[in-house]
Every structure is written in structure tokens, then in C-alpha cells.
From Swiss-Prot:
GO terms for biological process: coenzyme A biosynthetic process; pantothenate biosynthetic process. Its main location: cytoplasm. 3-methyl-2-oxobutanoate binds at D41, S42, D80, K110. This is 3-methyl-2-oxobutanoate hydroxymethyltransferase. Homodecamer; pentamer of dimers. The gene is panB. Its EC number is 2.1.2.11. It is found in: Cytoplasm. The lineage of its organism: Archaea, Methanobacteriati, Methanobacteriota, Stenosarchaea group, Halobacteria. It comes from Natronomonas pharaonis (strain ATCC 35678 / DSM 2160 / CIP 103997 / JCM 8858 / NBRC 14720 / NCIMB 2260 / Gabara).
Length: 268
């Protein structure tokens, strides 16, 4: 799968996208039919113990992206560019994004976008680095906007639509729309020739993306626009409790889990 293959799905077949942060998750998700694996900066608060995505570094993203890429054969691997890895200096941004393809074997990068990323999107696209744009709620700007629904009034909705058009013209191959009204997402989808992938953006986008921890039930809670499809957290706790109980009771390890050599004499 390449960026051009995802772009070709616009208005055709639904796109499934899911976060992945490690090789086992990537392998399972790809086997389950996921089209796009997003190595999200949400690795910060799902795997690394941070309170938000803001502390995540380029090195951390490269490491997790490489792990996902090593376990992936067909799905498109998209590396999320972390806070302050782009936007201030274009040359630095190109270097950081280039690392994700050269060192981590990603297929594309995702940028949380605004007016400042239109030029960068064109530069990256011209250099052969596929860009997935991200508009609406952009968590890296939480200190400015808060983690609230975006595009809820005419002015902000028009701004999102215009930025979507500008990033498409700059070369973005797809667009993530997060936590925006469903009717706005539908309008943006109709206005673009590249696919839109929604998260909390209603049913009319070309695809959907969710955080894997929420999908499988590993997270303690879920976003209001997400859905749990399993209870991995409960199953993990049950299995670990069974293990600790077995060790405490002396029932593990048993003879079937132990190996003895008849020709070794008692050393005592």
C-alpha cells in the first residue's frame, strides 16, 4: 500500500485507519485488514506515561515507527510528527520528516496543520515525502484551543474548509478531520478530491481512524466519539491475576513446565 493507493480510495471504498505503536499491534492490525497504521504521537500518553502528547520527541517517534514498519507488509505506515518538530524552521522540518522515511521506514508523515503548514506540505510533497494533513481538533495546540470540538461556528468552519483546500492543492494525499461537526466533515469531503478520514467527524468521511487502545478496550476510558470493541484490559488483568495466584499457591511452575536431567547428580 502506498499513499497513491489511499488517495485513489476517495469516494470509493471506506478507509480503515488505526493507531499502532509496536510490532505486535501492527502485525495484528494488518492481519485484521486495517489499511493505514498511524504511529500517533498519542504514544506519549498511551505507552510512555506522559500526561499529553507534547513531550514526545522525534527520536521516540522514529523508534516506535520503525517497530511498526518492521512488522508491516501491506498497510500504509504513517508517522505522526510531534510537537515542535515542524513549523518553526522549514529545513529542520524537512530533516525531521525525512528521518521518518529514511531511518524509520515510514511511508508518509502526518502534520497537525494550520496556515503555517501549507508551504511545508508543498515542500515535502515536492521532495517525495507524502503528507497526511490533520485539521479540526489538533491536540498539539491544546494550550491554545483546548481539547474541544472545532468548526462549530461559520467563521471557524469556513477556515477549516479553506485550509483543507489549500493543503490538497499543496500536495497532501489525505486529510484527517478530528472532532468537527458531521455536516462540516461532509462538506469538506464533498469539496476535496483527496480522501478524508474522520475521528469524531461523523459517518460521511471517506474513512475512519481511532486509537487502538480504545478500540480493543485497553484504555480505562474512551473519547465520547470513540467505541470499545473489546475488553483487553479486563482480560489482561484476569490473566495476570491468575499467574500471580498460581505462583503464590505454588501451582506454577509444575513438572510440565520444568526440565530435569537424569545424569546431573545432586550437588548437595
Amino acid at each position: 500500500m502506498r499513499a497513491k493507493d489511499i488517495r485513489a480510495k476517495a469516494g470509493d471504498e471506506p478507509i480503515t485507519m488505526l493507531t499502532a505503536y509496536d510490532a505486535p499491534t501492527a502485525e495484528i492490525a494488518e492481519a485484521a485488514g486495517v489499511d493505514v497504521l498511524l504511529v500517533g504521537d498519542s504514544v506519549g500518553n498511551t505507552r510512555l506515561g506522559y500526561d499529553s502528547t507534547l513531550p514526545v520527541t522525534v527520536d521516540e517517534m522514529a523508534s516506535h515507527t520503525a517497530a511498526v514498519a518492521r512488522a508491516t507488509d501491506d498497510a500504509l505506515v504513517v508517522a505522526d510528527m510531534p510537537f515542535l518538530s515542524f513549523g518553526a524552521d522549514e529545513a529542520d522540518a524537512v530533516d525531521n520528516c525525512g528521518r521518518m522515511l529514511k531511518e524509520a521506514d515510514a511511508d508518509a508523515v502526518k502534520l497537525e496543520c494550520g496556515p503555517h503548514t501549507v508551504s511545508l506540505t508543498k515542500t515535502l510533497s515536492d521532495l517525495g515525502i507524502p503528507v497526511q494533513a490533520h485539521l479540526g481538533l489538533t491536540p498539539q495546540r491544546e494550550n491554545e484551543t483546548g481539547l474541544y470540538r472545532q468548526g462549530t461556528d461559520e467563521e471557524s468552519a469556513n477556515r477549516i474548509l479553506e485550509l483543507a483546500r489549500e493543503h490538497e492543492a499543496a500536495g497532501a494525499f489525505s486529510l484527517v478531520l478530528e472532532h468537527v461537526p458531521a455536516n462540516l466533515a461532509a462538506s469538506v469531503t464533498d469539496a476535496l478530491s483527496i480522501p478524508t478520514i474522520g475521528i469524531g467527524a461523523g459517518p460521511d468521511c471517506d474513512g475512519q481512524v481511532l486509537v487502538v487502545d480504545e478500540v480493543v478496550g485497553l484504555a480505562e476510558g474512551t473519547a465520547p466519539f470513540s467505541k470499545r470493541f473489546g475488553d483487553v484490559r479486563g482480560e489482561m488483568r484476569e490473566a495476570i491475576e491468575a499467574y500471580t495466584d498460581a505462583v503464590d499457591s505454588g501451582s506454577f511452575p509444575g513438572d510440565e513446565h520444568s526440565h530435569y536431567e537424569d545424569d546431573i547428580e545432586d550437588i548437595y
